[in-house]
């Protein structure tokens, strides 16, 4: 329950329209609570340019959109060019890990061995496995086999066998920047049903990418993914999705794949997030009752698949960062 002072701060009393900048001049409070820079101040993006020559019009557009009721990301979520370069350096390691796994994974390999590959490759290339220790997670990677939707914990006992499909979800920290992507691997010869699920899930990610329009909406992506999955007779997990990432492992926004076009956060250039739908062969319901507190399975025990990419919105579309 809020006390009176908290309620007052949250809007029951009128807030001033202006606050003092560092130089003592008055600045308008922007939609995200920050004070608008002075025209001749150095821009917040790190370009070294004056604000009026850089992001002033951009910020005014954001402010106007927010005041019409649009869900506009705070500018703190928008990645600067320097931050994007840092994320790319992290992603180079993350992509390299998954490429290494692609060359070595196969029947007879334990998921514990996959975890060791991830840890060794990442640390040898100057990175840190982002999964390791995150909210108590015990391993360096997630390995989700067949009916495991996500957060499969590597184990000596889980030996990959002919006909399995497995998602390897890898995340890296390097120089303080985060990257994240996952791939599906077919172990030996798999059934047509499993192969089709893996293929369609990857195609669904591309449908989501095709739906991206700068200044469009996050819901456009989820709607495109969901429609394609349903066209092919599959269902989409509601409880898990993509997320913002870059300076932290999990940032806003949550990227749902059960959405309507024209809804959700505005896709503002600089917004960085993942697209990672979890698509089930059967029903969408999931089982989160595993005693380890992490591993999620399909409720009906049928196979599931997931591919994940990380991207940043640009002025003319998007740039893939990790895959």
What are these regions (language model features)?
Residues 38, 47-53, 57-323:
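Active-site neighborhoods and metal-handling regions in enzymes and metal-associated proteins
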């Amino acid at each position: 329950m809020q006390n009176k002072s908290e309620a007052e701060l949250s809007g029951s009393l009128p807030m001033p329209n202006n606050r003092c900048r560092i130089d003592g001049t008055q600045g308008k409070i922007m939609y995200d609570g920050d004070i608008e820079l002075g025209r001749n101040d150095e821009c917040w993006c790190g370009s070294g340019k004056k604000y009026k020559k850089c992001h002033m019009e951009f910020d005014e557009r954001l402010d106007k959109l927010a005041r019409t009721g649009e869900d506009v990301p705070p500018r703190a979520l928008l990645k600067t060019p320097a931050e994007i370069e840092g994320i790319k350096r992290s992603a180079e390691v993350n992509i390299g890990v998954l490429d290494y796994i692609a060359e070595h994974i196969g029947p007879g390999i334990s998921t514990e061995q996959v975890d060791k590959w991830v840890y060794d490759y990442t640390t040898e290339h100057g990175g840190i496995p982002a999964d390791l220790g995150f909210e108590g997670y015990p391993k360096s990677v997630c390995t989700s086999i067949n009916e495991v939707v996500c957060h499969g914990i590597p184990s000596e006992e889980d030996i990959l066998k002919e006909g399995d499909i497995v998602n390897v979800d890898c995340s890296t920290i390097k120089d303080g920047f985060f990257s994240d992507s996952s791939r599906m691997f077919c172990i030996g010869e798999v059934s047509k049903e499993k192969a089709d699920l893996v293929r369609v899930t990857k195609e669904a990610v591309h449908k989501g990418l095709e739906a991206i329009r700068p200044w469009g909406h996050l819901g456009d992506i989820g709607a495109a993914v969901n429609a394609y999955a349903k066209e092919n007779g599959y269902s989409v997990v509601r409880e898990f999705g993509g997320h913002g990432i870059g300076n932290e492992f999990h940032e806003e926004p949550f990227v749902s794949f059960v959405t309507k076009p024209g809804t959700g956060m505005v896709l503002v250039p600089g917004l960085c997030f993942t697209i990672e739908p979890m698509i089930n062969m059967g029903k969408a319901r999931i089982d989160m009752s595993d005693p380890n507190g992490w591993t999620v399975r399909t409720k009906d025990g049928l196979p599931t698949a997931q591919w994940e990419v990380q991207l940043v919105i640009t002025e003319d579309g998007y740039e893939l960062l990790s895959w």
